[in-house]
């Protein structure tokens, strides 16, 4: 009978390297001259598909991250990297390389028109606001969350039902409502200023990504 031998030793030179962060929503499609276009903005599924808004706007998806807080499966957090500045981003000196699905893309992860719409500091402030609000709202070890859960357990689920009935709501829901109000306020300010930038509530995406609506890149 033949024996199969396996070598479990690992060559030090083949040891795994530290992973580099990138926006996992991006993907490549074939371009011209053997180049690949980086698809980094997407159809605006948050509006009526037959509307002019759908035709004139696109969505940027900021990925969720899992290394910045405890309980990352319970506390949604999003990348603070400006699109195209991620350590694993694809870089290129080309501004525009081609079109795909009637939209303009290039060979890099950056979106050329984005800095004309929102600055890096504004972007980081918005993402930080969302992250901090979600960290407070969903922290399972906060005193208020623990107390509410204990009272709800002892009352057989009546405590939170009573809070909802009285319009007081749970601590988590109140914090999420505050975040919704802040997002609406920022969107209204941008609209008054004529800035083509809108924050989509992370609740709409199930906290899987933080979506921003921008004018369709040309």
From Swiss-Prot:
Topology with respect to the bilayer: Peripheral membrane protein
UniProt keyword annotations, A-Z: Endoplasmic reticulum, Membrane
Keyword S-adenosyl-L-methionine attributed: no
Signal peptide range: none
InterPro entries: Golgin_A_7/ERF4 (IPR019383), Ras_palmitoyltransferase (IPR051371)
GO cellular component terms listed in the entry, alphabetical order: endoplasmic reticulum membrane; endoplasmic reticulum palmitoyltransferase complex
Swiss-Prot/TrEMBL GO biological process terms: protein targeting to membrane
Protein localization: Endoplasmic reticulum membrane
Family: Belongs to the ERF4 family.
Free-text function comment from the UniProt entry: The ERF2-ERF4 complex is a palmitoyltransferase specific for Ras proteins. Palmitoylates RAS2, which is required for its proper plasma membrane localization.
Subunit: Interacts with ERF2.
Protein name per UniProt: Ras modification protein ERF4
């Amino acid at each position: 009978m033949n024996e199969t031998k396996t070598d479990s030793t690992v060559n030090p030179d083949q040891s795994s390297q530290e992973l580099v962060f990138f926006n996992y929503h991006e993907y490549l499609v074939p371009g011209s001259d053997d180049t690949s276009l980086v698809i980094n903005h997407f159809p605006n599924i948050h509006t009526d598909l037959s509307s002019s808004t759908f035709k004139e706007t696109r969505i940027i998806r900021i990925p969720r991250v899992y290394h910045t807080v405890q309980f990352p499966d319970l506390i949604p957090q999003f990348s603070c990297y400006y699109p195209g500045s991620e350590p694993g981003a694809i870089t290129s000196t080309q501004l525009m390389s081609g079109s795909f699905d009637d939209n303009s893309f290039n060979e890099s992860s950056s979106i050329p028109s984005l800095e004309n719409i929102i600055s890096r500091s504004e972007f980081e402030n918005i993402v930080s606001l969302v992250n901090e609000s979600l960290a407070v709202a969903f922290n399972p070890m906060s005193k208020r969350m623990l107390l509410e859960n204990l009272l709800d357990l002892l009352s057989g689920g009546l405590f939170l039902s009573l809070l909802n009935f009285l319009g007081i709501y749970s601590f988590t829901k109140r914090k999420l409502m505050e975040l919704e109000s802040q997002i609406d306020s920022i969107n209204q300010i941008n609209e008054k200023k004529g800035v083509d930038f809108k924050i989509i509530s992370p609740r709409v995406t199930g906290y899987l990504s933080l979506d921003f609506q921008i004018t369709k890149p040309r």
